[in-house]
Amino acid sequence: MPQQAITLELDELDAEHVEQACFEAGAVSVVLTDCRDDAILEPAPGEVRLWPATRLQAVYTEPLTAETLAQLAIVIGCAPSRLQVSEIADRVWEREWLRDFQPMRFGERLWICPSHASVDDANAVVIKLDPGLAFGTGTHPTTRLCLEYLDARAARDSHSGSDTPLVIDYGCGSGVLAIAALRLGAAHAVAYDIDPQALTATLDNAAANGVAQALTIANEAPQAPLAADLLLANILSGPLCELAPRLAALLKPDGELVLAGLLEEQAAEVIAAYSPWLTLRPWRSLEGWVCLAGTRSAAGEPA
């Protein structure tokens, strides 16, 4: 049976109130999207930001009556005419999303592939990953940069005969970076995130890729004397600057630090924040985003 949807454009301050009202009126899902393609780059700590102009779509499986619409308009505080009602096809939305999510290549060997697809490459290192609860499927430039770094590092280690005993994925999201590091040869990984959904997704994804036994998840930030050969943090520039002493302390001598989630114009500030411990340099940029990388010297001074 076709479903119905209410679409409404509103400002940031109204969004949470309207979302709750739609659920109370029987909505099975509510999606908030940006009306004007405005980026949200640096919310304050603990703040959840929406766009200045937000489009809300609430989906209903039961027919929307005139009475329901009138009551909803009263609760929201708008004229009923602002509530745009439309019919949408009765689809399995997860399958629709998966249909658009195709295998992606990162560097020479690393691929992310949805569970319904395969990669025709005998040398491929494949991560099976479907869109889910947590951020990080490789579609965002910052995630792509980190994955390409991991692929390049694995190729370098293969040529030099080096190994990677311990990787830390700081702010793991879906766990894709930790899983990629393990699939590319790291012996053990620690995946940290404060979001319980992220840790659940990380565990599920690690199990699906056969690396759960080599992965430790943590909802408390790793502390020294844990010493990583490689630490990746794909978060925002503000937290990256604040965390500089902690992240630097988690690196063993000659350990590598990879930072992403920042724009090119934010790189200088982040590089300066880490300068007491190591020298970060731009590794690669993509669509205005930059990935920084550096190695901590044996003495813990800038290298």
Language-model features, listed with the residues they occupy:
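SAM-dependent Rossmann-like transferase core, predominantly class I methyltransferases
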Residues: 90-161
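Conserved SAM/SAH cofactor-binding pocket of Class I
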Residues: 133, 137-224
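S-adenosylmethionine
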Residues: 153-156, 194-302
